[in-house]
């Protein structure tokens, strides 16, 4: 694995390096975050969207006729039961500025970090550490065919719209319960202009303490 970057405030950087504090948040937190649209906030976090440019084609069962609907297809994972920790593959002044970061911490040995992460997660009985996934985010356009991705919650958790591609995100994701079970998603057709569902008031989070990480990190002042 290549080095990974996390953008922090000074206080949070100190907590990460000295105590190994890693805060996993539920996908629903980022879905409902309202303070910085297009940075941390993503109202479609945890949802795979398919919206073809020429309309969503469906076949009428009675007549066999194919028609194009203006609706979009949404497949949503269990957003309160999938916890993620987000980093970046790029040390960038632009990324730092957009996140309003004071410090960038470069994780020099991600494999050692991952081992510590697995060990800490294994102590949380509600989580499935054996199903922990970690990869660069796959960025996509809504017109792209969803293939089988719509039925796979762990793939949905690792995808974001291309408008976020500047973040070069690398994500760690772990499920609670059966959140990664195949087809454990809510699928619906959404008509144009339909109001967004009410936002959640509570968003689960998970604070891990991995111990001092200074030997596998480099701190960059911004």
Describe each model-derived feature in a short phrase.
Residues 1-222:
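NAD-dependent ADP-ribosyltransferases
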């Amino acid at each position: 694995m290549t080095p990974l970057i996390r953008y922090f405030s000074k206080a949070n950087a100190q907590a990460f390096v000295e105590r190994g504090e890693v805060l996993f948040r539920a996908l629903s937190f980022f879905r409902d975050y309202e303070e910085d649209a297009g940075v941390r906030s993503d109202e479609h976090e945890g949802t795979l969207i398919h919206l073809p440019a020429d309309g969503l084609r469906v076949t009428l069962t009675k007549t066999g006729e194919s028609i194009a609907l203006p609706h979009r297809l949404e497949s949503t994972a269990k957003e309160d039961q999938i916890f993620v920790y987000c980093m970046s593959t790029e040390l960038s002044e632009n990324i730092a500025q957009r996140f309003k970061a004071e410090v960038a911490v470069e994780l020099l040995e991600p494999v050692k970090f991952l081992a510590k992460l697995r060990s800490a997660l294994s102590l949380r009985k509600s989580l499935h550490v054996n199903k922990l996934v970690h990869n660069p985010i796959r960025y996509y356009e809504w017109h792209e065919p969803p293939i089988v991705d719509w039925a796979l919650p762990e793939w949905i958790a690792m995808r974001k719209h291309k408008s976020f591609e500047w973040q070069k995100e690398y994500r760690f994701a772990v499920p609670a319960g059966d959140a990664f079970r195949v087809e454990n998603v809510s699928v619906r057709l959404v008509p144009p202009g339909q109001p967004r569902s009410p936002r959640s008031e509570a968003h689960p989070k998970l604070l891990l303490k991995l111990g001092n990480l200074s030997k596998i990190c480099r701190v960059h002042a911004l």
